[in-house]
Amino acid sequence: MEKIAILRWESGHVPQGLMQLEQLPGNSTNPASYPFPVKLVEVKGANTDTVILHPSQKLLEDMIQLAKELEKEGVRAITTSCGFNAIFQEALANAVDIPVFTSSLLQVPFAQALVGRDRAVGVITASASSLSEKHLRACGITDEMHPIVMGLENAPEWSKIFDHPDDSFDMDLVTEEILNVARQGVKDHPEIGAIVLECTDLPPFAHRIREELDIPVFDFNSMIGHVAMALSIVKLY
């Protein structure tokens, strides 16, 4: 049986561009991204508005109920398909007795420890304007860490998910936009020693970012892989 459950957005409420990204190897909602089975669970009412733009208390209550049901079914850990669920991290983790890891932002303190106090961690997010102090604090990110947040919401192709959700992505354009945000971030902030990709649709681009910038890049897959090893769902030896 599937040992890790991924709480995902409701079908019919996912922007067309993100549905394209779901087909890529490495995407959080593509089962082929993992060397172990995962259980994808739709959360009714989960969408751009209720997760990113206006985090919903009702949605949180529904997620808690689903988490409890999954725990009873024997699932050993629960994650989510959007890094902005970080704002629900404490409530979800407190609601069940199995590990809950809502967002790749949980890796920022780890990355900061790796690069040392004189360097910074860059965070590439779907929307910098929506990523609040509450999201960061929920993941253990303190004032002393000073992560450098780089948003994609002003990139014309990417912004379709907010402004024109029924429009498809030009995949070449959106790929270049993602890479450019990473390039420009490191150019403007040469102190960046590692990057964390908040958005769970960005892991398919992580290899390109690593190759171009030659720094560690953490994403949803590095997080779920870490937990899978901790639970012996996968083994290195």
Which residues does each predicted region cover?
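Charge-patterned, long linear interaction tracts outside catalytic cores
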Residues: L173-H207
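N-terminal active-site wall of soluble small-molecule enzyme domains
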Residues: Q57-L66, F84-A91, A95
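Short, acidic/small-residue loops that bind anionic groups at enzyme active sites
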Residues: A91-V115, R210-A228
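Gly/Ser/Thr-rich loops at beta-strand to alpha-helix junctions
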Residues: E10-H13, A77-F88, S104-Q107, A126-S130, ...
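N-terminal glycine-rich anion-binding loop in soluble enzyme alpha/beta folds
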Residues: M1-K58, S127-F169
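Non-catalytic positions within long, well-ordered alpha-helices that form the structural scaffold/packing
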Residues: E71-G74, Q112, V186-D188
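Glycine-rich, highly charged phosphate/nucleotide-binding loops
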Residues: I52-E69, L173-A182
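C-terminal functional extensions of proteins
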Residues: E198, L202, F218-Y237
